[in-house]
């Protein structure tokens, strides 16, 4: 039998792929930008062989909510500098561009980045270019302009970002018409919503979640602010009802939206976020320890989530939500050859939530990234 020859062969003592069911020692074989074989029985030679004897080999990580941008957004950071070297091969922008600047964003970020970048286009027509907030008045929430921009060129646009938090809306501005405009844009375009719900008592969560539809994603899910997922010490009934209707829940860590007590309470009740994301943006640059997706994943492990559940929610599950099942977030033959290599550091700095609470334990750290068959 003729021996197979590959461009790249990557070996590790543990491969994990929720999409194909892999969890054990093996190798991934790559030709061009495609995975052609994976698992324990992969044999053959390759032009380049990489061995990682003490690491975990995963599909390239998928960050469903962050801020990849180059100058177009008050939050933006370069995806090829701040995501790709940290194991993230696919990242979605939460509203860095809107109808007025989507063409510039596509030209300067989506089309020029080595990282795969998707966009949840902002309902605010200027995106995140305002130095303070999205919505200064209701005219900023232009459903028709948003839908028209998607209809004109929907490439790489996953859905629509609607954020009605206190930080996104001017003081005194009613968030309800903004949410209504987002839902209108979603109906006009046939796209899902990525929603930052109101986290203030002026609009209770129980009035917001029933507005959302199957496939819509709620982000900032594990915050300790008012109107979080809990009523008292338990998951609220309306949160369970939203999940049963098909509404999805994303982490969206950021600067304000990860609390260990909230995470621990939700996990203890069996309510796991659907996707693990960083909401990484320019305030995180040069943070110590560095905020990234592997560290965010490690925090959920420390909070009690099973490791396999965490790994799936940073790879296969967000890829599926983004419509990339079989292309990203997978080690199955035929998938794009995007890989992340992580190593567990038991001596890492303590894991800290946004309120300063710490949990001891190790942390996943990035070792290597492969994007489209090329080592980064």
Roles of regions detected by a PLM:
Residues 1-44:
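N-terminal metal-binding scaffold of metallo-dependent hydrolase/deaminase domains
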Residues 13, 28, 33, 54, ...:
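Divalent metal-coordination and catalytic microenvironments
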Residues 43-44, 52-112:
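Metal-associated gating/positioning segment near the N- to mid-region
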Residues 62-66, 91-93, 117-121, 158-162, ...:
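Hydrophobic faces of well-ordered beta-strands that scaffold small-molecule active sites
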Residues 76, 86-97, 112-138, 161-164, ...:
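Metal-cofactor-binding active-site regions of metalloenzymes
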Residues 166-287:
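Active-site core of metal-dependent hydrolases
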Residues 261-344:
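His/Asp/Glu-enriched, well-ordered alpha-helical/loop segment
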Residues 336-376:
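C-terminal cap of metal-dependent C-N hydrolases
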């Amino acid at each position: 039998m003729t021996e197979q020859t590959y461009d790249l062969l990557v070996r590790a003592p543990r491969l994990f792929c929720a999409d194909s069911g892999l969890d054990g020692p093996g190798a991934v074989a790559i030709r061009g930008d495609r995975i052609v074989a994976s698992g324990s029985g992969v044999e053959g030679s390759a032009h380049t062989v990489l061995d990682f004897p003490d690491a975990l080999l995963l599909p390239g990580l998928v960050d469903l909510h962050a801020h990849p941008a180059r100058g177009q957004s008050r939050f933006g950071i370069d995806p090829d500098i701040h995501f790709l070297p940290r194991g993230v091969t696919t990242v979605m922008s939460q509203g860095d561009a809107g109808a007025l600047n989507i063409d510039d964003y596509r030209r300067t970020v989506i089309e020029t980045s080595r990282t795969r970048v998707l966009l949840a286009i902002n309902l605010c027509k200027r995106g995140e270019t305002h130095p303070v907030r999205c919505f200064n008045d209701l005219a900023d929430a232009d459903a028709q302009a948003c839908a028209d921009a998607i209809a004109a060129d929907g490439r790489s646009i996953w859905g629509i970002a609607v954020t009605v938090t206190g930080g996104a809306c001017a003081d005194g501005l009613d968030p309800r018409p903004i949410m209504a405009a987002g839902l209108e844009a979603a109906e006009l375009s046939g796209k899902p919503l990525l929603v930052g719900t109101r986290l203030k008592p002026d609009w209770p969560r129980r009035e917001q979640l029933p507005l959302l539809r199957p496939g819509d994603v709620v982000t900032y899910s594990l915050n300790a602010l008012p109107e979080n997922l809990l009523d008292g010490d338990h998951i609220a009934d309306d949160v369970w009802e939203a999940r049963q209707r098909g509404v999805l829940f994303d982490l969206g860590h950021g600067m304000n939206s990860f609390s260990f007590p909230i995470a621990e309470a939700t996990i203890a009740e069996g309510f796991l976020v659907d996707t693990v994301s960083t909401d990484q943006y320019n305030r995180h640059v040069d943070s110590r320890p560095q905020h990234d997706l592997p560290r965010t994943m490690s925090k959920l492990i420390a909070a009690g989530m099973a490791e396999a559940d965490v790994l799936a929610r940073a790879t296969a599950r967000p890829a599926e939500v983004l419509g990339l099942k079989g292309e990203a977030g997978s080690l199955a033959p035929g998938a794009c050859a995007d890989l992340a290599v992580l190593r567990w550091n038991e001596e890492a700095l303590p894991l800290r939530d946004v309120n300063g609470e710490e949990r001891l334990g190790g942390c996943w750290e990035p070792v290597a990234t492969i994007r489209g068959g090329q080592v980064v």
